Amino acid sequence: QWYPKMVVYDEDGWNADVFHAEGEFYGEFGNFDVKFDLPKAFIIAASGVVTDGDPGWESVTVDTSFDFDIWVDIYDSTYVKPDSSERRTVTFLAENVHDFAWVASKDFLYEGGKHNDIDVHVLYDKGRGKKWTKDVLEGSIRAISWLEEKFGKYPYPQVTTTDRIKSGGMEYPMLVMNGREDEGLIVHEYGHIYFYGILANNEVDEAWLDEGFTTTQTTHYMINRYGNHGFDLSLYEDRAEFPKKYWPLGNSLHSSQWSAIRFMRSGHDENISRASYLYNNGYAYSRNAYTKPALMLTELKYILGDSLYYDAMQHYYDKWKLKHVNEQRFVDAIEEFTGEELNWFFDAWLHTTHHLDYGIKSFKKSPNSDGTWSVKLGIESIGSRFIPLLVETTFEDGTTDRRWWKNHLWRYEDTFNYSVDKKPVSVTIDPDVQTVDLDFRNNTTNMKKTLMFDWPGFWHNPRNEYVIRWMPNFYYHQESSGLAPGLTLDFDYGPYESTTVRANYAYETQDLYWYLGGWRQPVHFFPRTTFHYWAYNRPGVKELGGEVEKQWDRVYGRTPTHTISAGFYVQPAYDSTRAVNLGYDPNGKLGVGYLDWSSEIGSVDMNVNGASSLGNLSDWNFTRLTVTGSLSVSKKMFRFKERIIVGKIWTDAKGVPGQEGYNIEGNSSNDMVRKNYLVDQFYGFELQEGESLINHYHMPGEGNLRGFVGKGERGAEALAAFSSEASISRSIKKLNFNIEFAAFADGGLFWDRLDETSNVIGSTFISRTLADAGLGLRLKTDIFEKDLYLRIDLPFFIHDIEGSSFDKENWVISFQRSI
């Protein structure tokens, strides 16, 4: 606030609000007559109209009949910079506004236009002119035209869009400052001139009355102009390139709905109607000031219909423009115009955290003697918010019938009886997905399904469809199964379910390898709790397992986030021809139960894992406790990473199987079996006779001493180890390439009970001090949206039980980061 602002006196008395990080000052309407005296080199814009002096626009007006680059060359060669001693005096008058803002810059260029009798000004930094020229002026004119059409006549003589140093946007009466040329941002900020500027709410107490309103009108504008995806495709040249040209377009409304639903189900939901500074954090503020009220207004438009909704909004605007508004004045205006009592709708949205979830309980149809069909539709409310529903009946010929079910108030169950002219085959409630119904799966008797290739880097998440993604895959192992081609199918729906089915058939051995796994989240219970399951017969290993995962944080959206998991896995059998090379001990069955806690605090990640064999399900008997911590800090192109692991295994004389002990080098068996190329030992590729690429592959984890990959160093039953890495990176944007040079050191103490003389496990722990150090190279790019990462490390220094040595030929590669 750059000037002393008059406190508003309204029906609640004096509003002497202090400054809060969320929400702006509540202002009183008045006239601002402001005179500026500044160096002439500065071009100025402000709320209001120029009544005296020259703001400098004419001297920097862009001739848009030229290509911008050509015009800038002419401008740079002809523009005469004012002398540093010259001054510019200019006066702006802003009438009937509750705030006044101004912006000045030596680098501004100007473009101007008109919408009816409204002057439209655009000022932008010369360095960003190629993106701003023409488009921002045209977008500004379209935005003010849209707002006048939908809400009412703009009451001021001008509107100005200016550039700003920081990204994002900020609104003032007659003036917005935007950090980018984005059309959606223009519409959003211009919407604020209506909702905040003209209809002046107290943003500290009721931020939703402006943020929610302009968010929803922006969404409707962008969908109206560009389609359901809600953005200008022409601005994204790569959308026409492979593979993006084959990606289905998303739905901007669905994205907003999913965002709200995730927050509503988090266990941290809060009422919309709350002072901005009372929300738990900025995330809760944004969802309750922007997302949720915008979706509330979309639902209101759905209930009233587009025409009545906008007519009612215009009534609200006409009645309260250039005055102070609040929740009651808005609700009263809508009810007054529509003639409907809507407290049941607004109270549930604004003053509770009740959720909407309707479902079809039953669908019965029967033919009548006159050729019509009777339908009995059982509707149930699993949630606690109530709303009328549009019911769509689909017939055999693909045509539909739409009608409203309005027996909704306070009903958890109802039967909707109606007749149709043709035989119905399916029914859907809320077919256009306009409500924030938590779970659409029960809204229809015939859920849509979309089959698509599993494009790398793409995620398609519609509210009203199952998404089935497919991807071919294969195993190839020349020493056993030969080629085993296969297919992976992923079945997904929002945050609630995911199922993966994979099958591979080996022609030579007639073996069928398969995987079935996935997860589920309850809709209404156990917030942020995921139930995982899996079973597979991969080459070398069979496994069955399950896990319950719970995420929790004291303040939603802010670290630390704690993840607590409990699970089990059983490996009943192994194929030694494949399993041994992955570090598995195939001599007996294995069953393990575990508890796991992980958290992140800023740049620090922590994990504690406790595991134990499962009685009769396991031929081994052991208990394991492992604590891992990692740190990653970076500044500009420099990065430092550190990992520390401490762990111990308690077991009997039989010891612990290789897949459950601590590997010195990493290369965890249970991690390696998830990678086809590691299961298949790089498909038999040999560097030279007797030496496979797999002998140089580093899968990070456990001891993580990369210098010991392929050295045959036995594992440990206890360890205290570290990995450190410092690196410097350089991005080559023209080549879409990142290169990173690293120096690393790994080391630790490792204990086991093996008596090397007798090769028998004893009772005394014997320690080994092991370490390595070296240099590395990391390469990162992407091809067709698939991220590609290659790590090459040269651990030339080795310290083992025989002492220290240098090995210039020691090298490892990996497709995973070391820490």
What are these regions (language model features)?
Residues 45-46, 342-343, 356-431:
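Beta-strand-rich binding/interaction modules
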Residues 563-567, 579-734, 743-744, 751-754, ...:
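C-terminal outer-membrane beta-barrel translocator/porin domains of Gram-negative envelope proteins
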Residues 92, 121-377, 427:
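Hydrophobic alpha-helical and helix-loop surface patches within well-folded domains
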Residues 474-480, 491-493, 503-509, 520-522, ...:
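Transmembrane beta-strands of outer-membrane beta-barrel pores
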Residues 774-775, 807-819:
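Outer-membrane beta-barrel "beta-signal"
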Residues 387-389, 397-399, 405-406, 414-423, ...:
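Outer-membrane beta-barrel initiation region
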Residues 505-589, 641-685, 790-793, 799-809:
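Outer-membrane beta-barrel translocator/channel fold
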Residues 6-14, 21-190, 216, 228:
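Hydrophobic helix-coil surface modules that form long, contiguous segments used
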